[in-house]
């Protein structure tokens, strides 16, 4: 148990996968535009609300994801393939430079204009803790389902939300330094990492399904 608790390569891979999937740097321009009418204090409150919501959503996915799959009779290998396809699709949109705009539909965009609090919707859900991040968390939680691993993932999610909070606090400064070109470059790099992670999900799922089909 102690060995799994200190299995830092697994936790690091999970953390990097979340970072690439959510791509908080790419969401910064969206965050700035959505909070442009707010005071500095209100923007900080929105930032805290959004990232706390992200952590809660991913924690629920981590601990209850396997139960939800069993409730609907979905095998983890099938879910790995579906999640991998979704992750690859998001990665392709990131590489093409869409900056995650596919995560929010037209109705959600129109509702944003009249919504007083945007911290939970649409920032936390679906822009950050969207289907890709949720499915990825469920896959990791079911693959490494011991208490020690789940606690490690719990801490990794908390650190991820903390990092996103810090990035959003520095949002105006980062936009001035990186400019749109720099943000686009980072987004494409994250997209490549994300595509590799999605393909790994698909391959793992296929390996799990085919032995059953051959029996």
Curated annotation (Swiss-Prot):
Membrane spanning residue stretches: 14-34, 54-74, 81-101, 120-140, 147-167, 189-209
GO CC field: plasma membrane
Keywords, in A-Z order: Cell membrane, Membrane, Transmembrane, Transmembrane helix
Localization terms from the record: Cell membrane
Membrane topology: Multi-pass membrane protein
UniProt cross-references to InterPro entries, sorted A to Z: Multi_antbiot-R_MarC (IPR002771)
Record family assignment: Belongs to the UPF0056 (MarC) family.
The protein's name: UPF0056 membrane protein YhcE
Encoding gene (name): ychE
